[in-house]
Amino acid sequence: VTYIPFDFERFDDRTDYYNYFGQPDIVIHLAWEGLPNYRSSFHEEINLPRHYSFLTNLIKNGLPDLTVAGTCFEYGMQEGCLKEDMPVLPANPYGKAKDSLRRRLEEFKGNYPFSLKWVRLFYMYGKGQNPNSLLSQLDRALANKEQVFNMSGGEQIRDFLPVEKVAENIVSIALQRNIDGVINNCSGNPVTVKQFVERYLQLNNKTIALNLGFYPYPDYEPMKFWGDTSKLKKVVNNE
């Protein structure tokens, strides 16, 4: 693996970044600053133009194939099973910025032909996760031998996927050439947050009392949603 340094704050559109990065056949773009502060204006005011300028520079200079990480927050407050062909109604600055980036890149295809795969990520967990994420907090409570773990009511329904599987799916999506556009990267299995925590404890042979309802439910995401995996399965199974 060759690591090539790049600082977004020193971006210069006069530079040919496609050549700088060794003229890659495919780029998988995962970078995005400021998370998990989903409601910060930073996403639209700074991240959106910054990442659009960088990606279009690559494309203008010859990049033929681009895969970008999107987010389930592009669907907004819609509930139930979320499919890629549904209208998007992002309700927070992070979701709005990602949706705007996707739309602008799709418009850019009118000037420069390239393959665009937009991977909508749902809820990931595993090695390297944010220290303030649910399981990170739970692991700390267990390590500290705490008797009680404070959490929300736990009845919200989510779609969880191990980060290793998320990465595997992203690579499969990026390498194939049959399906472009938006692709959900999720399990397709709805589960309550309470069930998710209980299963995690069971798998790790751990016990701790769950103080349900200590935290309010987030107001920036719907109560019950999960992803449709029909399109993802076609990619993974080479259909």
Language model features: what each stretch is:
Residues 36-43, 77-82, 130:
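Conserved catalytic-core motifs of eukaryotic protein kinase domains, centered on the activation segment
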Residues 29, 52-93:
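Conserved Rossmann-fold NAD(P)-dependent oxidoreductase catalytic core, especially the SDR/UDP-sugar
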Residues 144-239:
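C-terminal substrate-binding subdomain of Rossmann-fold SDR/epimerase-dehydratase oxidoreductases
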Residues 3, 66, 116-119:
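Hydrophobic/aromatic anchor residues within beta-strands of the central parallel beta-sheet
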Residues 93, 97-100:
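Active-site helix of classical SDR
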Residues 103-158, 163-167, 171-172, 199-201:
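NAD(P)-dependent short-chain dehydrogenase/reductase
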Residues 8-47:
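NAD(P)H-binding glycine-rich loop region in Rossmannoid oxidoreductase-like domains
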Residues 31, 67-71, 91, 120-122, ...:
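Active-site beta-alpha turn of Rossmann-fold NAD(P)-dependent dehydrogenases/reductases
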